[in-house]
C-alpha cells in the first residue's frame, strides 16, 4: 500500500503536459553563447527543451526575431521547435528597450497559438522577467498554468554592481514583482535564490521549486590536455587560466587580467565577446592588458562551439569565474566536468556549483590581490585530487536530472491550477478567460 506522500508524488508525476510554450523574449536558444545577450540562459532553455522532448513533451520556444533572415519556424529536433516572433526592428534594439515591444511580442505568440484548437498548450514556462510579462497574459488567455524562471533579479544585480556598470532600471523591479505575484510556480537554481525571491519580492515559499541547471556530460568530459593546447597554440609547459563568458563588467574579466599582472608567467585565455555595457568600450580589456604590460600573456578568442569550448576547458589549468553576480554558473560546472578546477567568486549560486577546497576555491572578495593569491594557490595545489573531485562533482548536475525536476514542478503547477483558485492578487484578478474565436478573419 502506498503512503500518502508517495501517492501524492505519483499523482503529481502523472500530470505531465503534452505540449508546452516556452517564452524567451530577449535571446534565442539558437544564438551562440558568449555573444550579445546570449549566455547560460540560452543553454538552459535549449538543453531542457531537448530533454523534455525525449520524455514525450513537445516544446515550442517563442523568441524575438533579430534578423530578416530568421525563419518564422525552426525545427530543432523531433518535439522541439523555435518560433521567431517579429516584434520591433530586427537590429538596434538594446535589451533595455525591449519592454516597448512586449505588446507586439505577446500578440505574435497569441496569434501563433490561435490557429490551433483550444487546449493546444498545457502550460507556459517563461524565462526572465520580460518573458514573464508575456507569459502572464498567455496564461490567462489560454487557461493554463504559468511557470516562471527569473534567472536573475534586478535588486540582486544592483546590490553587487561592478564599478561603472549600468544599474537595472526601476521598471524591471516592478515587472519582476508582478510576475512573481502572478506565476503559478517559480523555478530557482539554488536555495539562495529562493530566499532572495522571498525576501525581495515576498514570494510564497510553497510555490518555489529549486531545480539545479545541468551540464552535457557527453560533450564536457576530461580529455587530452596536450592536444587541446596544441589546438589553441598554447605551450605545453605554461600555466593557463581561462575565462569563458560575455565580456562585460558584471562578469569581471578585468579582475582576472589585473590578477595576472601579479602572477609572472601565467597565461590568461579570454573566450567570449563584448556584451551589455561592455559594448560601450569593446577593446577595453585588450587595452588594459597593454597598459599593464602583459599583452603578450593574454590571449583572446571569440565565442566557441560547445565542442571547442570543451577543448578550452581541457587546455586550461584553472577556469576563473569572477562574476559580481551569478545565479548559478554553468561555466563552472562545464569546466569541472572536463576535470578542470575552478576559482570562483563566492556569490549567488557559485558556492553550489563549486565545492570549495575540493573542486576549486571560492574567493569572498573582488580585490585583485585576493584573486591573485587564490589563483596562485590553486596552481600549486591543482594536482592534489582537485581534477578527480571536479569530475565527480559535475556528474551530479545532468540536464536529465534537471528535466525530471522540471516535470515534477510542471505537475505541481497543473495540479494546483486544477484545484480551487487562490484569491486575487494585489495586481489583478486571476480569473481565466479565453477570447471568442472569430472565423473568416485574415491575420
From Swiss-Prot:
Protein's recorded name: D-inositol 3-phosphate glycosyltransferase
A Pfam family name for this chain? Glyco_trans_4_4
Its ancestry begins with: Bacteria, Bacillati, Actinomycetota, Actinomycetes, Mycobacteriales
As for family, the record states: Belongs to the glycosyltransferase group 1 family. MshA subfamily.
Reaction it catalyzes: 1D-myo-inositol 3-phosphate + UDP-N-acetyl-alpha-D-glucosamine = 1D-myo-inositol 2-acetamido-2-deoxy-alpha-D-glucopyranoside 3-phosphate + UDP + H(+)
Identify the SUPFAM superfamilies for this entry.
Answer: UDP-Glycosyltransferase/glycogen phosphorylase
Q: Where does 1D-myo-inositol 3-phosphate bind?
A: 26, 37-42, 95, 128, 152, 172
Quick one: which residues bind Mg(2+)? Answer: 313-314, 316, 340
Alphabetized, the UniProt keywords read: Glycosyltransferase, Magnesium, Metal-binding, Transferase
User: Which gene is transcribed and translated to give this protein?
Assistant: mshA
Task: Name the CDD domains on file.
Answer: GT4_sucrose_synthase
Taxonomically, which superkingdom?
Bacteria
Outline what the protein does. Catalyzes the transfer of a N-acetyl-glucosamine moiety to 1D-myo-inositol 3-phosphate to produce 1D-myo-inositol 2-acetamido-2-deoxy-glucopyranoside 3-phosphate in the mycothiol biosynthesis pathway.
- UniProt cross-references to HAMAP family, sorted A to Z: MshA
Enzyme class, UniProt record, top EC level: transferase
Q: Which InterPro entries match?
A: Glyco_trans_1, Glyco_trans_4-like_N, Glycosyltransferase_grp1, Mycothiol_biosynthesis_MshA
Assembly and oligomerization:
Homodimer.
Please give one Gene Ontology molecular function term for this protein: acetylglucosaminyltransferase activity
As recorded in UniProt, its EC number(s) are 2.4.1.250
What processes does the entry annotate via GO biological process terms?
A: lipid biosynthetic process; liposaccharide metabolic process; mycothiol biosynthetic process
Summarize where UDP-N-acetyl-alpha-D-glucosamine binds, as residue positions: 32-33, 40, 246, 251, 304, 326, 334
Enumerate the NCBIfam families for this protein.
mycothiol_MshA (TIGR03449)
Amino acid at each position: 500500500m502506498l503512503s500518502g506522500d508517495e501517492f501524492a508524488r505519483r499523482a503529481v508525476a502523472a500530470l505531465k503536459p503534452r505540449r508546452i510554450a516556452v517564452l524567451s523574449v530577449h535571446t534565442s536558444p539558437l544564438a551562440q553563447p558568449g555573444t550579445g545577450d546570449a549566455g547560460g540562459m540560452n543553454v538552459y532553455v535549449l538543453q531542457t527543451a531537448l530533454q523534455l522532448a525525449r520524455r514525450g513533451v513537445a516544446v515550442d520556444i517563442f523568441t524575438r526575431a533579430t534578423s530578416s533572415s530568421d525563419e518564422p519556424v525552426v525545427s530543432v529536433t523531433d518535439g522541439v521547435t523555435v518560433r521567431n516572433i517579429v516584434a520591433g526592428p530586427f537590429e538596434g534594439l538594446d535589451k533595455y528597450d525591449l519592454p516597448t515591444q512586449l505588446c507586439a511580442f505577446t500578440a505574435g505568440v497569441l496569434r501563433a497559438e490561435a490557429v490551433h484548437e483550444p487546449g493546444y498548450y498545457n502550460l507556459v514556462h517563461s524565462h526572465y522577467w520580460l518573458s514573464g510579462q508575456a507569459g502572464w497574459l498567455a496564461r490567462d488567455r489560454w487557461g493554463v498554468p504559468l511557470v516562471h524562471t527569473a534567472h536573475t533579479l534586478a535588486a540582486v544585480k544592483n546590490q553587487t554592481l561592478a564599478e561603472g556598470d549600468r544599474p537595472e532600471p526601476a521598471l524591471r523591479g516592478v515587472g519582476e514583482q508582478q510576475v512573481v505575484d502572478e506565476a503559478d510556480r517559480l523555478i530557482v537554481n539554488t536555495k539562495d535564490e529562493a530566499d532572495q525571491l522571498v525576501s525581495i519580492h515576498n514570494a510564497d515559499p510553497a510555490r518555489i521549486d529549486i531545480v539545479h541547471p545541468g551540464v552535457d556530460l557527453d560533450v564536457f568530459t576530461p580529455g587530452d590536455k596536450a592536444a587541446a593546447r596544441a589546438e589553441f597554440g598554447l605551450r605545453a609547459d605554461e600555466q593557463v587560466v581561462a575565462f569563458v563568458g560575455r565580456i562585460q563588467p558584471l562578469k569581471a574579466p578585468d579582475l582576472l587580467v589585473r590578477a595576472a599582472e601579479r602572477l609572472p608567467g601565467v597565461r590568461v585565455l579570454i573566450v567570449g565577446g563584448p556584451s551589455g555595457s561592455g559594448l560601450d568600450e569593446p577593446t577595453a580589456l585588450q587595452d588594459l592588458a597593454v597598459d599593464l604590460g602583459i599583452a603578450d600573456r593574454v590571449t583572446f578568442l571569440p565565442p566557441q562551439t560547445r565542442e571547442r569550448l570543451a577543448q578550452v576547458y581541457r587546455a586550461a589549468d584553472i577556469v576563473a569565474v569572477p562574476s559580481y553576480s551569478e545565479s548559478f554558473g554553468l561555466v563552472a560546472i562545464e569546466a569541472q566536468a572536463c576535470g578542470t578546477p575552478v576559482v570562483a567568486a563566492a556569490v549567488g549560486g557559485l558556492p553550489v556549483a563549486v565545492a570549495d577546497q575540493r573542486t576549486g576555491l571560492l574567493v569572498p572578495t573582488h580585490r585583485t590581490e585576493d584573486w591573485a593569491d587564490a589563483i596562485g594557490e590553486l596552481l600549486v595545489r591543482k594536482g592534489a585530487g582537485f581534477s578527480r573531485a571536479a569530475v565527480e562533482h559535475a556528474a551530479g548536475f545532468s540536464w536529465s536530472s534537471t528535466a525530471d525536476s522540471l516535470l515534477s514542478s510542471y505537475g505541481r503547477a497543473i495540479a494546483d491550477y486544477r484545484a480551487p483558485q487562490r484569491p486575487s492578487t494585489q495586481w489583478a484578478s486571476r480569473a481565466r478567460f479565453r477570447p471568442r474565436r472569430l472565423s473568416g478573419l485574415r491575420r
